[in-house]
Amino acid sequence: MTEFIRPRIIVAGTNSGVGKTTIVTGLLSYFNREGYRVQPFKVGPDYIDPGFHAEAAGHSSYNLDTWMTPPDKLNETFIALSKNADISIIEGVMGLYDGGEDGISSTAAIAKQLNAPVILVLDCKSVGYSIAATALGFREYDKGVNIVGVILNRLGSDRHEAMVREVMGKIHMPVFG
């Protein structure tokens, strides 16, 4: 765990393809346009998504990868690279708990190490009330991961959105979008 206070958020997903990169790029662009110094990061060794991040933020995005950076150096690296930022936005890799054996290098492991709150992106296409079980499962799977809310992606209609928001309320899961 970290002892520092530095504004940061992780945008994670239930799996690849749920819209993490699109959402993170939108957030980076928004904060940059509003005059905030936003520092992007990507969990893992990906070099494509950081290119999108850099375009939106106006400067480099960095990888947070405990395969390449020893875990005991990760906090030090994060602090150094985010020192001039008003907020850091970290895009997760694959699904929140996916990584190497025992979750090494997973987004969840990075979130716990950096003591970073997590916003979980849910793909709501072709699902209604059952999406609450998915969100609840992710929240309960590891209580050390601080899932602070969700972003609902690929909603089919206003009615669909209302249904999903209602069921998220039943499990006390904040919806950010």
Regions found by a protein language model. Give the residues of each.
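ATP-dependent carboxylate-amine ligase catalytic core
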Residues: 2-18, 22, 28-114, 122-149, ...
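GTPase G-domain guanine-specificity segment
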Residues: 149-177
